[in-house]
Amino acid sequence: DQNLILLDGIPVYNADHLLGVFSIFTPEAMKRVTLYKGAFPARFGSRLSSVVDIRTNDGDMKQYHGTASLGLLTSKTHLEGPIWKDRTAFNVSVRRTYLDWLARPFLDKDKKYGYYFYDVNAKVNHKFSDRSRFFLSFYKGKDHCDYTRNTAYEYDYASYYYNDGMDLNWGNTIAAARWNYVFNHQLFFQATMAYNHYDMKMSTGYQNLDKVHQEEALYVYDSDYHSGIHDYSVQADFDYTPHPAHHLKLGTSYLYHVFQPEVMIS
């Protein structure tokens, strides 16, 4: 928890899929990555370990281009280009795994297991003038894991039927608006408003149906566990260069945390 990972300046609470096998960042959507292993600037806060600062692609204002790839486990597509040539550009990247589809034909009909994840990156970049730019960026990623098991036992004197299952989801949602303005060759200003949400939900259920001597008894157990974080933030930064040998960074920020732990059992 002492490693800070930023996507366009916004903290990312969960940066991987499949317990660390895949990163949530698709290369086509990224512009640059800066790693601070230590002695990082004060603007990154009070984390004790490292900082990974990731910036997404702004989009091409001149022409359209993109890529599409089909892999053994995942497929992804990327497209960028102008909305208004030389003024507004977009960048969109989508990725999804299909482990759930590939495994389905090989599973027992009474036992169903599934896992998938997806990522969506989108960004719009508008140029008001040579001095002023506005950016809208969005990220949505999710992991989903589930299983269902049905078991039946038949005896001369009784019949038992068991059904249990689990549904687990976790992921990030990030939305940000940023405005850059160049006052002159010495002073640069940047304002950012952002919303960041991490959510984890797990639901489990168990059902037992017994038939003994024509009498029916039903037992049901359900539980829901939810852990969520909502961040609302506003930030303003100034870069001032009074002399080629001096560079001053000033800024202020406000961050409002909302924590949502929840347990429901019935």
Q: Which residues does each PLM region occupy?
A:
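Membrane-embedded beta-strand positions in outer-membrane beta-barrel channels/transporters
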Residues: 32, 37, 51-53, 65, ...
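Periplasmic-side early beta-strands and strand-to-turn transitions of outer-membrane beta-barrels
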Residues: 61-62, 84-170, 200, 204
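Extracytoplasmic loops and strand-loop junctions of Gram-negative outer membrane beta-barrel proteins
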Residues: 15-16, 35-36, 59-62, 104-108, ...
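Face-selective signature of the C-terminal outer-membrane beta-barrel domain
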Residues: 125-143, 166-266
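Transmembrane beta-strands of outer-membrane beta-barrel pores
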Residues: 56, 72-74, 83-85, 96-100, ...
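N-terminal periplasmic accessory domains that precede
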Residues: 20-26, 35-38, 42-65, 77, ...
